[in-house]
């Protein structure tokens, strides 16, 4: 250590002393001597100067004279000297005077140290200074309770003056503790936490979490809430999402497009994605198993971020169940399986697979005869084969085509000695399959042909002789047989044919049979509809009334099958035989159809009362009312998906030569997955004269739904698939307008007159131009110019594959290419109240919203904004647009008219 000596003393100025000898001094010396024992022997040599070490000669800064002494003004000096380092237990100080007139007033001996201190949340002990005045002594610190070191070990330096300097490292409060006054780490109270070590303070527990003890580094999630592995402790606890909504499935042969709405509840997270679980089922949808690896999912099967997936390579005519799971970052933390929505579909017939191989049967100079096996997966009846061939040295673009009704073909008109590349593909009613792999075959050269001919000459001669003998024998036999032949009348067919080959149909295509062609209508019912024992049927509730009786929701439990929901049409008591025949004719019609977009007949009950027709149950009911209830809630792609399903069903019906005659949104049913199915195949309304329903108007002895019917069908009763296409165009308009009434409040006669004058419906609000153009195509006056349903399906498929084509919204040009009906905006001056105005624009359901919020006059209503509509409870986007458009027109009319408006 180093020792400091503070001396207070006075010195008299030598010049102020009279008769001062020359030995007068004004300084003295300071010495020290280290020892391990007391030295108090007067004769000891240690009292001599020699063992002492001189510290310094001490001189006074100020001295005093005799004058000062007389006035008692002593000038005291204070000097501090240090020495060291000391290595022994003690030391002696010595002051040597060489003749100075001085007084040593006091001596203070001390050493310097750095005091104990708390700095940077660490405690540093009392530390002695170093041996030299410039020395720095390192002091190691210890973190205070509930604090931890950060990075490097913490230390301070004690300098020669006893001051701390140069701090290195620090401690901070550990997780669960917060700093207080920079010297204490205080525990976080209950309901608060601190996740990390550092200077941060405690915070309230995030949403859906709690802490019940002090010093919590993390808050525990409440029941049903979780944190993902990558979530920080500061993040709120979240839950799993609810299931996806409003699934639309579009089946295209052995592929399907699925679309859906996101879950209503995301669990408080923004990382929702979707998994598709594919299950292939038996025909009764029992014994489902996971799909194999051959099924393709685009963009992928798991972790989808978009609400759309395209699935292909499915089996033909096979029931599938697809589960669309909604998952997020905490789904794997929940003990429960992900929420999902299921959709059941049945694939259609696909095109055949490729032909595996070809064989050369024969070759000549100008022809090649080939044969091949049937495709491994014909997926239907092979109608014919198409052969593509071209010279190997030429490009594929120069290929030629040939067709064969069998699996052999002779390609004629070839060049001698040339190698040809040949491919073949099969065709069914579903279309062409893929071409086979390329194979090469060569025609004979002239030399090869002559050589082969020489080898066959003996065989040809022998065959000719045998042929003459055979012909003579054959003539004799034919003479004998002709005498025994008798002609009989053609046998009468005992069974009705269910498959015809017509000029329009393809071989093997099932054709619709009109049940009214049966002499006994019961025969048609037995042939096309399955009889169900009434004990298997349970009626639950009335859901409507049909033309012949009430309609119920019920349950059907067939033996060895699961129970399903069904719709049950009943025939009211007191029916006539004609009414019974008409009632059951719909079942005879439905029973002939098997398509995912046609309502499915489960069976009939005819052996007990009441007579029943049992069909699959469609949860969302009729399409028109469903759209009105969900105005503005679907994307354009979802609406197009609905239209595509309806068109696919109608394509199926038209290919069976069935004409619907009453295609309208009210006759389309919607299930829980938003799959649309064509229904209502009863013909009785056309045979009666019931004026109770204004939708149907008498024409030429029958009932016609004028607003949906093609002009040739109204005028001439000419119903064809082309007239169904016209009706489909009206259905398109209904869908895009969310269930508005076609031609609004026009009378049926006004509608007929407008159509005859070539007026057509304008595009509904926000309707894509491409869809309105398709409507106009369906409404061509010349029925031969209208598209077929197959073309409509293809057009809609292209729109679905290219959503950008639907972004252009249709507008009515100043000079339209075709005159469009104008639903003129009502004259505001004709209204006397807000109630009248709302009724005129078909928004009367919001009357109480307006009046209870103070919007009681049209002048006040004219100033409303979209925010006002939200505030009074109008949340549907479609209704907001409709009301705002009318309000905007109201403002214009108010500004242009001086008429007083209520």
UniProtKB/Swiss-Prot annotation:
Residues 537-800 form the Protein kinase domain. It holds the Pfam family PK_Tyr_Ser-Thr. InterPro entries: Eph_TM, EphB1_SAM, Ephrin_rcpt_lig-bd_dom, Ephrin_rcpt_TKs, FN3_dom, FN3_sf, Galactose-bd-like_sf, Growth_fac_rcpt_cys_sf. A motif (PDZ-binding) lies at residues 900-902. The chain crosses the membrane at residues 460-480. ATP binds at residues 543-551, 569. The active site is at residue 662. It is an enzyme of class 2 (transferase). Phosphorylated. Autophosphorylation is stimulated by ligands. Expressed in the embryo in the brain and spinal cord and in the first and fourth visceral arches. Most abundant in adult brain, with lower levels in eye, heart, ovary, oviduct, lung and pharynx. Glycans are attached at residues 252, 344, 398. The keyword Membrane applies. The keyword Glycoprotein applies. Residues 1-119 form the Eph LBD domain. Residues 1-459 are extracellular. SUPFAM superfamilies: Fibronectin type III, Galactose-binding domain-like, Growth factor receptor domain, Protein kinase-like (PK-like), SAM/Pointed domain. It catalyses: L-tyrosyl-[protein] + ATP = O-phospho-L-tyrosyl-[protein] + ADP + H(+). It is found in: Cell membrane; Early endosome membrane; Cell projection, Dendrite. Its EC number is 2.7.10.1. Keywords: ATP-binding, Cell adhesion, Cell membrane, Cell projection, Endosome, Glycoprotein, Kinase, Membrane, Neurogenesis, Nucleotide-binding, Phosphoprotein, Receptor, Repeat, Transferase, Transmembrane, Transmembrane helix, Tyrosine-protein kinase. One of its GO terms (molecular function) is transmembrane-ephrin receptor activity. PANTHER family: EPH RECEPTOR A5, EPHRIN TYPE-B RECEPTOR 1. Belongs to the protein kinase superfamily. Tyr protein kinase family. Ephrin receptor subfamily. Heterotetramer upon binding of the ligand. The heterotetramer is composed of an ephrin dimer and a receptor dimer. Oligomerization is probably required to induce biological responses. Receptor tyrosine kinase which binds promiscuously transmembrane ephrin-B family ligands residing on adjacent cells, leading to contact-dependent bidirectional signaling into neighboring cells. The signaling pathway downstream of the receptor is referred to as forward signaling while the signaling pathway downstream of the ephrin ligand is referred to as reverse signaling. May play a role in axon guidance during nervous system development. May also play an important redundant role with other ephrin-B receptors in development and maturation of dendritic spines and synapse formation. This is Ephrin type-B receptor 1-B. It comes from Xenopus laevis (African clawed frog). The lineage of its organism: Eukaryota, Metazoa, Chordata, Craniata, Vertebrata.
